[in-house]
């Protein structure tokens, strides 16, 4: 296992050989706040739309995020913050680029379907499912809880990526227009998505997946890398996925990020 302190306040451990990654968010640092400020627009709208559409300002993006966020249950809020953290951290630590956006384009709700879809340096697709939770049961073993989250992610990504809901791919195909600038790359990615599409006669059923867990627990006891590796070994032995990455984030609470986003909206409205 190698450690990496690329972002202050985050102790990052990686086992690249076994595709195991853990972010211990020990402090909601200025680095992480700056990442939210610089990346939220592109995460929410897509980098193309965030660049080309002047109405997609940071303040308006915060506003739209909070419109969806503040009416939700605590569990849904944990999920939204967990998905935001995943969007922020995976591309920072792994050489992957998101081709999907975070916002629900049709309604004032959370995104349906794939949480995030990425491409790697070879333009292979990676389907990511994020599951968050963990701060309600004070006595539950953190490793057991983390593995439960990963198992939930596995169940959902299997259902989504191998299921017949064509709208899931249709949504990502639209997102590609908002996330990729290069025309040729855009066409190549759409062709790959079409191969996985349920309406394709000779549909590809081989998937690269990322199972991401966001565990809200105090860091006096940390997710064990060895447990994560053993869990991945068991999943690999099932031969369900072509490629498999496990990416776990441990943070004490989601509230500090919530308060920061609210303060940013308030601040920009009074400037």
Regions found by a protein language model. Name each.
Residues 227-271:
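Charge-rich, low-complexity intrinsically disordered segments
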Residues 90, 116, 126-132:
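Conserved catalytic cores of phosphodiester-cleaving nucleases, focusing on short active-site segments
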């Amino acid at each position: 296992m190698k450690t990496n302190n690329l972002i202050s306040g985050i102790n990052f451990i990686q086992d690249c050989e076994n595709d195991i990654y853990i972010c211990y968010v020990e402090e909601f640092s200025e680095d992480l706040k700056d990442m939210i400020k610089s990346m939220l627009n592109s995460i929410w709208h897509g980098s193309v739309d965030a660049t080309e559409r002047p109405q997609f300002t940071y303040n308006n993006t915060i506003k739209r995020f909070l419109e969806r966020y503040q009416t939700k249950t605590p569990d849904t809020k944990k999920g939204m913050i967990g998905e935001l953290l995943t969007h922020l951290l995976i591309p920072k630590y792994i050489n992957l680029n998101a081709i999907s956006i975070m916002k629900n384009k049709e309604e004032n709700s959370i995104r349906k379907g794939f949480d995030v879809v990425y491409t790697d340096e070879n333009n292979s697709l990676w389907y990511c499912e994020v599951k968050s939770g963990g701060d309600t049961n004070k006595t539950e073993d953190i490793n057991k809880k983390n593995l439960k989250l990963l198992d939930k992610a596995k169940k959902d990504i299997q259902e989504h990526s191998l299921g017949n809901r064509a709208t899931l791919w249709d949504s990502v195909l639209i997102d590609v227009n908002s996330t990729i600038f290069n025309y040729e790359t855009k066409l190549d990615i759409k062709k790959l998505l079409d191969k996985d599409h349920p309406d394709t006669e000779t549909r590809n059923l081989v998937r690269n997946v990322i199972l991401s867990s966001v565990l809200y627990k105090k860091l006096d006891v940390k997710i064990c890398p060895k447990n994560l590796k053993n869990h991945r070994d068991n999943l690999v032995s099932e031969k369900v996925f072509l490629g498999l990455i496990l990416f776990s984030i441990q943070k004490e609470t989601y509230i500090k990020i919530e308060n920061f986003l609210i303060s940013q909206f308030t601040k920009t409205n009074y400037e």
